């Protein structure tokens, strides 16, 4: 039984890793553009993601206030996604922000941006605002 449990755990771990993805700069820029993000703002979005999650869909971060940030955009569970903790304004389970399909992540990030602009993200405020942004023009 112990061997079976170990094998099962290994299979589950492989599957969980298979769902996670680290995007490249251009791959992310194209995904954002294909989901309605204006090309003029792509450098800001790419910079945000680079500094929030290092382009990883599986990124999580526990905050001092007890909340958690999820996924490539580091979307917080106190307001935006459902983990049994907060208001879930994006109407999405936080765990769905950790897979390699970022369509729903982008939809939620657009809502956050609509309400608060890029200032909703400390990664953008601290590393992108007023600074040299990534060039994504060669991606298209």
Curated annotation (Swiss-Prot):
Active site feature: 52, 69
PROSITE patterns, alphabetized: GLYCOSYL_HYDROL_F22_1 (PS00128), GLYCOSYL_HYDROL_F22_2 (PS51348)
Keyword line: Antimicrobial, Bacteriolytic enzyme, Disulfide bond, Glycosidase, Hydrolase, Signal
Disulfide bonds: 26-139, 47-128, 81-94, 90-108
Tissues of expression: Expressed in salivary glands and Malpighian tubules.
Pfam families, per the entry: Lys (PF00062)
Signal peptide annotation: 1-20
Domain called C-type lysozyme: residue spans: 21-140
Descriptive protein name: Lysozyme c-1
Organism: Anopheles gambiae
